[in-house]
Amino acid sequence: MKLVLAEKPSVAQSLAKVLGANKRCDGYLEGNGYVVSWCVGHLVELSQPEAYNETYAKWRLEDLPILPTAWMYQVSASTKKQFGILKDLMKREDVKSLVCATDAGREGELIFRLVYHQADCRKPFERLWISSMEDQAIRDGFAHLEPSTQYDALYEAALCRERADWIVGMNATRLFSCLYHQTLNVGRVMTPTLAMVVMRDAEIAAFVPKPFYTVQLGMDGITAASRRFDDKEDAQEVLAKCKESMKAMVKSMDRKEKTEHAPLLYDLTSLQRDANRILGFTAQQTLNYTQALYEKKLVTYPRTDSRYLTEDMKPMLPSLITQVAEKIGADAADWKADNGTELSVDGMCDSRKVSDHHAIIPTGTMCAADLAALPSGEKAILQLIAVRLLCAAAPNHRYAEDMIVLVCGGEEFTKKVRTVLYSGWKNIWQHFYPSKEKEQKPCGGPILYPNAMVSFSQAEIKEGKTTAPKHFTDVIHFESRQWKYSKCKGAG
């Protein structure tokens, strides 16, 4: 008999269904040589300081820092019953081994191991490591269970995170609470995050908007602008000179053909960023919706930092892409490449760039599911993931950018004109998420070439104001954190 421990009851039920453990018992399911149970999140947690020494029950500066040499754990008061069930199952004589089937990640590993050690279990266990809750993925996972020792380092990393949180939180909270005579919660992640928000708000509060001025020349389909002037009189002087002739000379025209590569597939952070920007969801909402979709077998594992798929997935992708496109109502003219060019999956598959889990994509189960029955938030996230899969397989977007430089009254005026050469993946994206900004099309204005003289019909001054930094939203906060991390990493 094997005891399988999942992280949540819903996951345990999915595993039990595939394994044939259909007999329902109090806190577990059993059958076909398996006992399947669940942990209900963190059943075991680090003990409070007073468990190490009664004197720590009172917060005093002289006791700091509190640095345990042997870490103590306790069973969470709200989950004692389920822990007791798991402990009894582990002690059953007919249970010869265990399967760690908690979420395939650092925290999932920690949840299982803490229960295992707190129950003083010595029986061998293996690891189920899957990226999809589809039935076939579960079968394949159980057919290829991995040695527990392969994930010892992952468990130790989770211990480091947990204990670092405890050391910083317990000591710093007591320190500042004693110093300021009020409870001030301090956390390893929470406090630096709060500091970033405070610093940004201070920047905004101290910001003083400053006016600036540009001179703009208008002609058939083109508006060219001067540099910014801080002094309005300088702009007025240039405007007066331009109005004397109402003509400008074309100094230069520089055309560059540019490419916007097809976007990578989503990892959790990039999905949260787009969901915030496009749908207005917070990071936590996006995670909750995606986790729910994962447990319903509609998308792959969400807590991933990889944006690629493994090479062995390549053969199944063309069929999946076609089914996904049909399921979400993508017209062939939108999701297939221009001029009948076939989609390519080569760019999204690179096993070297996949860490614990591959990128987030829809599953084959999604293609047969009743999506209309999904809650609106889950449905919106599922569409975002599905559309990104189609875009990632589509050709690059290509466009030409013309930089026009005019001279009038001794001042240069510039205008960028962008012309789409090949819509590529943007054809798909804009079908579902139309851009609020109108794409610039080739203008029907004057024929321009270097040294040509062109007449303009309008000359005016436009006034603007510098703007303060934006308040943090989830998406801006993500970018700020990644920038700070990259900066520190680059500093060596």
Q: What feature does the model see in each segment?
A:
Residues 341-373:
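Acidic, turn-prone loop/beta-hairpin segments
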Residues 1-162, 166, 441-445, 457-460:
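Intrinsically disordered, low-complexity regulatory segments
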Residues 11, 107-111, 156, 160, ...:
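Hydrophobic (often cysteine-bearing) scaffold residues that line and stabilize catalytic clefts
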Residues 9-10, 39-41, 103-109, 130-133, ...:
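An acidic- and aromatic-residue-enriched active-site/binding cleft used to recognize and process polar
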Residues 157-187:
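Amphipathic alpha-helical segments of the small helical/lid subdomains adjacent to P-loop NTPase cores
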Residues 281-352:
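Extended, well-ordered alpha-helical scaffold/bundle regions in very large, multi-domain proteins
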Residues 19, 23, 93, 118-123, ...:
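A generic secondary-structure signal for well-formed alpha-helical elements
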Residues 35, 43-76, 88, 181-291, ...:
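Long, highly charged, low-complexity internal segments
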